[in-house]
Amino acid sequence: WVKLCEKTPLVKKGADGIEIKDYKEICLTHHERLDGNSGMVLVSAAIREVDGQDKKHLMIMVPLGMALPPGLRAAVYTKDQWAKIAKNEKVDDKELKPVDLKYSLCHASGCTAEIEADAAIVDQMKAGGGLMVVAMNAAAQPIGFPVPLDGFTEAFAGKPVDNAEYKKARGQLMAQIRERQQAALEKYK
């Protein structure tokens, strides 16, 4: 988990009809899981906070190819439940409090769904072991996307990381993935 913040211009019209540019700080406490071979984002989850707004939002992105009408379902698992999942043990679903998210946007990287993240959701995430995201694929089969919550509480409460440093580290990771792809191609020539 990492916290990223940046000042973003929000343009609105004043009473006289003239556009006013107002800068708001938008922060994302964010986690993404990448495919180590392709670099494609498999799942991404974030809490979005906008300066001056009380409401926070839980945003989840899954890859393209999911059925849109059903939306997403996400549930926070306790640390004990998450440990059971890691061992492929059965978890009692009755204890879960899933939330349904509707897709709001699809783009080249995937489709994003969001919901207001009230204090109960944020508190569950702080205390939880993991967030299980379930989407339906085009064949109407449920696909699970696990998101560990290790480090969420510290990132959410902490200061944002330097955006330039994050961009540099992410660029290095993508370079490693491209090298791996190149090595695999060379192997099969």
Task: Give the positions of each predicted feature.
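A generic "folded-domain core" signal
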Residues: W1-K189
